Amino acid sequence: MLEERRLEVLRAIVEDFVLSNEPVGSKTLAERHALGVSPATVRNDMSALEEEGYITQPHTSAGRIPTDKGYRLFVDRLSGVKPLSRAERRAIQSFLEGAVDLDDVVRRSVRLLAQLTRQVAVVQYPSLSSSSVRHIEIVTLNPNRLLLVLITDTGRVEQRVVDIPTPVDDGVVGELRGLLNGSLRGRRVVDATEVAADLPETVRPDLRPHLTTLTTVVLEALLERQEERVALAGTANLTRSSVDFADSLRFILEALEEQVVLLKLIGSARETGTVTVRIGRETDVDALRSTSVIATGYGLGPAVLGGMGVVGPMRMDYPGTMAAVRAVAKYVGELLGAD
């Protein structure tokens, strides 16, 4: 394990390089930071850090820059995530509370995360597996066509137009609505699917064909894998850091167009409140080896509904970015859990 002073030197190198994008020299470090030692001692510490692979010397400079390994140690030794200001927290809460439905929550979340971090933001649509059915509404469009609206406790709204076998009046529609809500309301999705499949066999024969059609549509909505969708924002932010990517920017943009890559980056964040950081090759995506990915899960309490995070250069403000990701995830979880 590195001694504490060398860790402080590494921390100072990372912080200065993130701010300036210029290789950092020992004299500059000694002048800018209260390290309590001479430039010569700092120079010796930097030599030791370089030998152990935490920093490296670009060909064109006498200064040093962090390596993947150096960034990793810096992140692992963070004493805490930098808290957002009260104004920032209030702005996040106000912006997200303006959402009108679940799709709007996702759209606002991904835009907000991109703006706060100035990186590429990715938000996974929530999984229904931990959700419950809040209400099912049926509206008559004409005697042979109904509109079915399924609402979950996380705010997801699914609408389906349903053609039924024979004409129905408002009284029958009311009965069908009552049967569906009486059987499914409040049930977790994983339980509701089984109940819905068996429901038509429990009603009188004249309602059975209509209820069979409706429960088939309900099952399709409940079983749809919404969590395989992601929202993306802020790809233009990568151009601000194009110098960090050398010749790899095009490959990064191409990788971010692949849904499976995005899901791989953030879908593994399976805990709320815990922020994960993957640096360089830790992303396991060759095109993203010059990036870092910061992600967390969001949801209702400990139940994770999805993941969110950002993709940016390794030279990023890790404490600030981690704080923003955690804060947005926290407020999204609270919003989805609100009645």
Swiss-Prot record:
NCBIfam families: hrcA (TIGR00331). It comes from Parafrankia sp. (strain EAN1pec). One of its GO terms (biological process) is negative regulation of DNA-templated transcription. Negative regulator of class I heat shock genes (grpE-dnaK-dnaJ and groELS operons). Prevents heat-shock induction of these operons. Keywords: Repressor, Stress response, Transcription, Transcription regulation. This is Heat-inducible transcription repressor HrcA. InterPro entries: DeoR_HTH (IPR001034), GAF-like_dom_sf (IPR029016), HrcA (IPR002571), HrcA_C (IPR021153), WH-like_DNA-bd_sf (IPR036388), WH_DNA-bd_sf (IPR036390), WHTH_transcript_rep_HrcA_IDD (IPR023120). GO terms for molecular function: DNA binding; DNA-binding transcription factor activity.
